[in-house]
């Protein structure tokens, strides 16, 4: 039995567009978006424990272990393992490379990687669909990272269809603020009635398609986001990902990204990333 899985990637995502099309009776917003995986993310390391403990060995500022999605994901899967008569534990270390509150799905991706890795190590044998159902209990973005490939998302973000996206490089700016998602979705300024689109609409247009309905609200509340968008728009179709704060712009060639990256004002952290088609750990689930 394999007892360790090291260097497990938890890739970030970008929302190529994000439309808010309505609101459910329970308060959840109805969304349409294309989720794009990129080759930058956090890295996690897992070791099996025999005492049933779930232990996060990495200290994360502002994130107590008990509320960390990684620990919650492990405990959720552990509950499934116990139904099979197993009481496995795990040591989990996290190399955090993505910012908190960045709109890159970092915490959700970490949770998905945890479910994929521990499902393999603990030999719980859950299918991809079963893992996605567990993931939805943790957050609306988690199922996407378990889905395993770029997706057109609807509902609260959990209804997913595979979609082909352009081969792109991205320049991503971290404006230096952390955006509380709930603050954006609860804003009275938020547009909640964007006309629904079809996956074929995106597939035909792709580049510069749609917008991010959350961007206006976030940019008004957090001026550094507005500043980053304005600066990056000199070079192309810059927009915010998720509920912010990160801002990105697509480029066709790596050399184009490098040229712009060299000119980013020093007050911002910026980096480049390549679009990828599949989650690096997609092979762990069927």
From Swiss-Prot:
HAMAP family named in the record: IspE
The reaction(s) this protein catalyses: 4-CDP-2-C-methyl-D-erythritol + ATP = 4-CDP-2-C-methyl-D-erythritol 2-phosphate + ADP + H(+)
Protein name: 4-diphosphocytidyl-2-C-methyl-D-erythritol kinase
Role summary: Catalyzes the phosphorylation of the position 2 hydroxy group of 4-diphosphocytidyl-2C-methyl-D-erythritol.
GO MF terms held by the record: 4-(cytidine 5'-diphospho)-2-C-methyl-D-erythritol kinase activity; ATP binding
E.C. designation(s): 2.7.1.148
InterPro entries per record: GHMP_kinase_C_dom, GHMP_kinase_C_sf, GHMP_kinase_N_dom, IspE, Ribosomal_Su5_D2-typ_SF, Ribsml_uS5_D2-typ_fold_subgr
Catalytic residue list: 13, 141
Entry similarity comment: Belongs to the GHMP kinase family. IspE subfamily.
Enzyme type, top EC level: transferase
Alphabetic keyword roster: ATP-binding, Isoprene biosynthesis, Kinase, Nucleotide-binding, Transferase
Associated pathway: Isoprenoid biosynthesis; isopentenyl diphosphate biosynthesis via DXP pathway; isopentenyl diphosphate from 1-deoxy-D-xylulose 5-phosphate: step 3/6
Annotated residues for binding of ATP: 99-109
Top-level taxon of the source organism: Bacteria
GO biological process: isopentenyl diphosphate biosynthetic process, methylerythritol 4-phosphate pathway; terpenoid biosynthetic process
Lineage of source species: Bacteria, Pseudomonadati, Pseudomonadota, Betaproteobacteria, Burkholderiales
Signal peptide (UniProt feature, chain positions): none
Keyword check for Nucleotide-binding: yes
């Amino acid at each position: 039995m394999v007892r360790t899985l090291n260097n497990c990637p938890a890739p970030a995502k970008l929302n190529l567009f994000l439309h808010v099309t309505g609101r459910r009776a329970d308060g959840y917003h109805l969304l349409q978006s294309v989720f794009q995986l990129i080759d930058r993310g956090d890295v996690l390391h897992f070791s099996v424990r025999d005492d049933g403990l779930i232990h996060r060995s990495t200290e994360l500022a502002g994130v107590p272990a008990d509320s960390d999605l990684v620990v919650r994901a492990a405990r959720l899967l552990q509950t499934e393992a116990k139904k099979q008569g197993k009481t496995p534990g795990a040591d989990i270390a996290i190399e955090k490379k993505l910012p908190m509150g960045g709109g890159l799905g970092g915490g959700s991706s970490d949770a998905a990687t945890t479910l994929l890795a521990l499902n393999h190590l603990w030999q719980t044998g859950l299918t991809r669909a079963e893992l996605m159902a567990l993931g939805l209990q943790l957050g609306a973005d988690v199922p996407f990272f378990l889905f395993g490939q770029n997706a057109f998302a609807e509902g609260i973000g959990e209804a997913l269809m595979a979609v082909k996206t352009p081969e792109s490089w991205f320049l991503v700016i971290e404006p230096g603020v952390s955006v509380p998602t709930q603050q954006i979705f609860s804003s009275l300024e938020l547009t909640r009635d964007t006309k629904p689109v079809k996956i074929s609409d995106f597939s035909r247009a792709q580049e510069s398609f749609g917008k991010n309905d959350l961007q206006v609200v976030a940019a008004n509340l957090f001026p550094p986001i507005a500043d980053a968008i304005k600066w990056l728009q000199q070079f192309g179709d810059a927009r915010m990902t998720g509920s912010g704060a990160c801002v990105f712009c697509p480029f066709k060639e790596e050399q184009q990204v490098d040229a712009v990256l060299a000119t980013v004002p020093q007050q911002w952290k910026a980096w480049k990333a390549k679009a990828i088609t599949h989650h690096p750990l997609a092979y762990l689930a069927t």
